């Protein structure tokens, strides 16, 4: 990574993620929840509408480099995409991708920091957005506070964790995988607000076929 800055990794835990995003100003009526399986009866347990899916998977270079989907370098301006330059910040980058691409769906408190962060970074390109996050002390502090809130002991910021967060989002009828370490957003076909969760589940199945440890 271009930056030597490192954060403490986030735990994949809805309680942790919800405290984080609600402190940043996401409406309390919206929450992260666990998805317990990809079968229709388990997906039916997920509250609707589902605005985004955050996926955590083993960070194995041999499998991660096997691209699923196709890069789209000429993606629409309405898709918010940022690079990741902070070590262990993939949880926050996935959250930013999930929230920023649902600004028209999820209310945000204008007095809280995420709304300000979004307004400042929307005009920037992905590299500039990453640089802004590096320098945003409030985002860093919010991440650090919640990284200590998990059910397991938080690793040190210097630890190289063997897992990675990405976000799956819907934008203009297309399902995108947003990963700040990749060269561009990855397209996974068409979707809609009504079918997003089921379509995203099909993408997750492809991840699982690539890496059975997921």
From Swiss-Prot:
Its main location: cytoplasm. Keywords: Cytoplasm, Hydrolase, Protease, Thiol protease, Ubl conjugation pathway. GO terms for cellular component: cytoplasm. It is found in: Cytoplasm. The active site is at residues 90, 164. It is an enzyme of class 3 (hydrolase). The keyword Hydrolase applies. PROSITE patterns: UCH_1, UCH_DOMAIN. GO terms for biological process: protein deubiquitination; ubiquitin-dependent protein catabolic process. The record marks 84 as: Transition state stabilizer. Ubiquitin-protein hydrolase is involved both in the processing of ubiquitin precursors and of ubiquitinated proteins. This enzyme is a thiol protease that recognizes and hydrolyzes a peptide bond at the C-terminal glycine of ubiquitin. This is Ubiquitin carboxyl-terminal hydrolase. The lineage of its organism: Eukaryota, Metazoa, Spiralia, Lophotrochozoa, Mollusca. The gene is UCH.
